[in-house]
Amino acid sequence: LFIQDKYGSYFFNTPNDLYNGKIYRYRYGVANVDVPGDPNWAPRFGAGQVGFYAQDKWDVTDNFQLTYGLRMDIPLLFDKPVANKPFNDYARTKGWDVRTDQGLSSAPMWSPRVGFRWDINNDRRFILRGGVGLFTGRIPFVWLSNNFTGTGIQLSTYDTRSTSKLNLIYDPNGQKANAEKLKASGNQTLNVFDKKFRFSQTLRLNLGFDFNVLGINWTAEGIFSKTLNDIYYKNLAYEPTGQTLGQVDPSLSFDNRPMFKRVTTGQPYSYVYALYNTNKGYTINLSLKAEKHFDFGLDLSASYTWTKSMTINNGSSSVAQSNWNYNYTYRNSNDPELGNSAFNIPHILKAAAFY
């Protein structure tokens, strides 16, 4: 946990502006000392995850087995963020149905799964296997840590393009001099999450075939993963105007990116990052592997994997602002379309030799 822009963030239009100290934009995050009582304040909260798993194996015949199990995970958040009553009241009037002191649901996350293994000729030469189930990984509570820092109570964020009176201060601990020149008392960047928010869960199906042909052991496998719950962010402080950049600027008539307007004008809420769930997204993996073992001690193997992974938000940052700002979309940042995952590696080819 940290105070974003604590040491000041300066933006410049050109390298020459940087050289001349001509600031285009300035951002500064600071703890409101009269609230937490510490200029280096950081929130404290407790979280945990309880998991239970039961599994059984049934030998239906000599060459056909079923394995089935049930996992239950319970996410626990032992604290709540601080209530920002003015914002909570304002959010209610906007119909956002969010508040800064929202608690996390501790409803159990059930993950049943079943798998099979069929030794077709009962000689281990041709084996068909597969399964289907729901899966929940380790819960990334860092996504919720933003809500404890971004209540709008303990921190203020200065974000201005009115920089004529500001100086380029190289001392990271001397940024207060610029903050004191700003007329505003500091806008608030808030982080909230939907009261129905649940952590990520995936439906996964796999089918594999192990066989031996010409003395070579082969494995062909396919895995399909469908998103049931994943994350996506909205900036509630901005909404589309209904126009594109090309409509606003005729010289850019080819540009169909939507224009946005701030809907919190007159309020100190510059950015309101809200965390929601989505069921959009999937991953397909197809692989083929060959292995050859020689009696004189040489082992050879080669494999190829093709992957297609689609998502609407990679969740690659610990900061809500970054997860929203740097999520690629050509349409609407608050309603992103399905696109290639940042973690997608379409083609993987491996080869190995051991002696």
Q: Which role fits each region the language model picked out?
A:
Residues 1-355:
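Short acidic-glycine motifs
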